[in-house]
Amino acid sequence: MNKPLHSPRVLCLLFLVLLPAQGRTAEAAPPAEAKKLPFEDEIKRYEEADKKSPPPKGAVLFVGSSSIRMWRSVAADMAPLPAVNRGFGGSKASDVLNFIDRIVTPYEPGSIVYYEGDNDLQSGRKPEQIRDDVKTFVEKVRAALPQVKIYVLSVKPSPSRARLWPSAQETNKLLRELAKETKGVAYIDVAGEMLKDGQARSELFLKDNLHMNAEGYAIWTRIVKAALTGNEPEKAKQ
């Protein structure tokens, strides 16, 4: 006489047969991949370049968005000061925070020139949020490198983002105040000479009316180099 399939003995045998298969299925499941950070590929390229040719310690580190990344002549412009460019285009102030321990502190720079804000405002972030991210950047960097000087550049005007200029001005006001009250930080106004009658000077920009041309970078070179060599009106606090 056939035993019913639902008898205790049959059910027990089925359980013993299926249990190893379930274990194999669980073991074969791939681990969940960590979420990839924005700009991870750009940062990895810098890290690979550093392995082949490590930047000098004590150099001036330029970090920030495309206004830094596209400053391809910065090493020549800052000479004889050694300069390292680690800009990554499209970045916001919050993005730089993700990579402090990879493209900032490992270089042990003597000073840092920092530029963000353009893309933050374009994405809808508020001046106070930018100021807070810059403050966090300063705190994290100086916790690792207490002697480093940090020069925060003003948010620049541009014809393509003229509507954001009032917010940029408010951001610059907050950044200036942050520098005044923070040890080892200086604010550098690169925006003033880029204006004429309150509007961005179009002759300083590429056809996209956002990124600067050589004439625009010539202004930045003169102002930033003066600050780095101690000839600026607002010096970093010792």
Language-model regions, residue ranges each:
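N-terminal secretory targeting modules
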Residues: 1-62, 72, 76-77, 143, ...
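Catalytic His-Asp segment of secreted/periplasmic serine-dependent ester chemistry enzymes
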Residues: 13, 159-238
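Conserved beta-strand scaffold positions in the cores of enzyme catalytic domains, especially
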Residues: 62, 83-85, 187
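Oxyanion-hole/transition-state-stabilizing segment in secreted/luminal serine hydrolases
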Residues: 68-84, 93-131, 135, 151, ...
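Generic structural signal for well-ordered alpha-helices
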Residues: 100, 134-139, 172, 176
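N-terminal cationic-hydrophobic initiation segments that often serve targeting/anchoring roles
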Residues: 104, 138, 142, 179-180
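A short helix->loop->beta-strand "cap" motif at the edges of active sites that frequently abuts
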Residues: 145-149
